[in-house]
Amino acid sequence: MASDMTYTLDTCICVKIVQNPNFVNLLKLYIDSENSSVYVNEQVIKEIQRKFGYEINHLLGHLKSSLGVDVFYGNISDKIESDAKYLLKHTSVHNGDAQILAFTRNTDSVLISCDKDLISIAISVGVSTINPDQLHTGNLEFQINKGRDRIAQTVEKISNQVKKPVKKITWELYTA
């Protein structure tokens, strides 16, 4: 975990945190509660209010208490808006995601999102990302790859002719 890290949450992450308290435990492994801060920007709040009806103060309070970090509301400035327009012209990102991505670039923060398309575009424009849907697979892949270093031994199948005939054991009940 790095010190003084800032993160920007996408809409899907905020919704997952509110709807699934266990999801936060996974994120806490990657967010240092002492040296990190989290941004939720204007676009994310608009999407959440439109789709789910969460109030801004309720959402920010819930995120702060769940994650244990400082959570800040970020406005979409004119500079961010012009960067979003640039991203719309030069990438395949849609308007809402363009604003979220432009905000992330402007704040030099790490984007946390479950949106695979947004993540791939963010990586292509040089933004660091975290996809919590793939965090749990890292250790499993490491364990699988670790086993490749061993030399595999070939085992030949034993033919039926080599096997010894076996008597079938039957159990009988004797009563007196």
Region locations from a protein language model:
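Acidic, PIN/NYN-like endoribonuclease modules and their adjacent C-terminal/linker elements
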Residues: 2, 116-176
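Short coil/turn segments at beta-strand junctions that form active-site/ligand-binding loops
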Residues: 3-6, 36, 107-109, 155-160
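PIN/NYN-family metal-dependent endoribonuclease catalytic core
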Residues: 6-9, 19-57, 64-76
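Short His-Asn-centered micro-motif
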Residues: 9-11, 16, 42, 112-115
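A generic structural signal for short hydrophobic patches within well-formed alpha-helices
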Residues: 14, 23, 45, 118-119
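Short, hinge-like loop/turn segments at secondary-structure boundaries
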Residues: 55-59, 91, 129-131, 148
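Active-site neighborhoods of divalent-metal-dependent phosphate/nucleic-acid chemistry enzymes
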Residues: 72-124, 149-152, 156
